[in-house]
Amino acid sequence: MAWRGSIEIKDRIFGTLVYCFAIFDAIFFSTFLVNQFPLFSFFLLPGFPIAVVYRFSVQLFGMFGSFLVFMILFLGIVRNDRISHFVRYNTMQTILIGILLSLIQLIMQWALIPAFGNSGLFIETLYNVVFLGSIAASYYSMIQSVLGRYAEIPTISEAAYSQVRY
């Protein structure tokens, strides 16, 4: 997408780093797979520095800490026209991945786990599919960002494009 201008190295770095937030959101779904295959915990390493930021913000601001981090990302980066379109697009895409994971987490906690139990085959399979899908989407997007390309994830990318102004 050359019509948006060339993508500088610093934009590639920041475009890659924002996906650490999506990896942090995927940590919740990693329990079953990481317990069975500890090697998968390697894929969670980029999310741990974000866990420190979230923990600090929650301790400082209470239950509004994670909302504050969301607002900083959305208003400070996505809606800031002085930041390159590439970084804003990737930030919006990681916010959408995080929202999707949060919605899945709510559905799991309030509907599926009470109905099927906490450790059945169905629940474990859902956790593993959501975890692997979110990790695959995050790492795919990180690799595309390093290469200076826009990561195209069906539906999520379309929503990100509609939210990011030119």
Task: Identify the meaning behind each predicted range.
Residues 1-166:
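Alpha-helical membrane insertion/targeting regions
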